[in-house]
């Protein structure tokens, strides 16, 4: 992990009632970052990496983000190619929409989230291999086909002529689905790194290292004004989380 003397990038974790925020915050803190909960646009301030975690369905998730006034700022963040990590539902929300409930989502990735097929047992819960399609700094010092933890019934399917360039890794459980994507500073994973043991922490550490090397925030590039924020106190919480209550 990153030595404590190095700069700790500020990470904003979107709190919209659909994620295990404390475990995500704890994992990021272990990885060398500082964590802040994002509940309104003004909380973004000097955040360097925006993380959208989550479990559940797309429609209520988008409704909560809209009610918090965060849909526009998140879209602006993505359009500005600022550092972003979507985890599980957070990855699915990057697509145009979801077949689960017909919701229109953030539209950063052309394609839709569709139910797993090909004989997969639903929901797909547990450890499974992540097989890389290409090398990427997020998987540095992580062996190919390493096991990560999944909890979901749907997965995003990129479309269009450049869809293949977006995919970092795939996983097979009855059928193959996209388990990691990257485009510029936009990252997304279907697995839960905060629940995936040493490899999950290594993944988060790699992301934090990428943000650190990229430098601090350019205030002029921020899509929202700086405002008061809620810091996360997660130091006493275990990284491993209890069983989830809902499944995407």
Feature-to-residue mapping (PLM):
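Short, surface-exposed beta-strand/loop micro-motifs that present aromatic residues
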Residues: 175-182
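Extreme N-terminal starter segment of soluble prokaryotic enzymes
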Residues: 7-12
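Cysteine-nucleophile active-site neighborhood
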Residues: 55-127
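Acyltransferase
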Residues: 2, 186-233, 241-248
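Short acidic low-complexity segments
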Residues: 35-46
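Pocket-forming structural segment of enzyme catalytic cores
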Residues: 96-173
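Beta-strand-turn-beta hairpins that frame and shape the catalytic cleft
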Residues: 145, 182-187
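Structural signature of beta-strand start/N-cap positions in the alpha/beta core
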Residues: 34, 49, 83-85, 147
């Amino acid at each position: 992990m990153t030595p404590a003397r190095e700069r700790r990038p500020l990470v904003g974790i979107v709190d919209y009632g659909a994620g295990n925020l404390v475990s995500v915050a704890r994992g990021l803190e272990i990885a060398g970052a500082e964590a802040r909960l994002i509940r309104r646009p003004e909380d973004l301030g000097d955040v360097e990496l925006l993380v959208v975690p989550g479990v559940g369905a797309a429609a209520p998730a988008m409704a909560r983000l809209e009610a918090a006034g965060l849909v526009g700022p998140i879209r602006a963040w993505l359009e500005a190619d600022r550092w972003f990590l979507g985890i599980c539902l957070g990855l699915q929300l990057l697509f145009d929409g979801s077949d689960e409930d017909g919701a229109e989502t953030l539209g950063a990735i052309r394609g839709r989230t569709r139910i797993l097929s090909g004989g997969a047992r639903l929901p797909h819960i547990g450890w499974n291999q992540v097989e890389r399609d290409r090398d990427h700094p997020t998987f540095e010092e992580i062996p190919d086909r390493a096991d990560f933890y999944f909890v979901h019934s749907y997965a995003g399917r990129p479309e269009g002529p450049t869809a293949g360039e977006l995919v970092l890794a795939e996983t097979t459980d009855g059928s193959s689905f996209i388990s990691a994507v990257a485009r510029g500073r936009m990252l997304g994973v279907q697995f839960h790194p905060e629940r995936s043991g040493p490899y999950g922490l290594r993944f988060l550490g790699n992301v934090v290292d990428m943000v650190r090397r990229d430098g601090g925030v350019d205030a002029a590039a921020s899509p929202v004004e700086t405002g008061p924020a809620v810091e996360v106190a997660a130091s006493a919480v275990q990284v491993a989380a209890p069983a989830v209550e809902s499944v995407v």
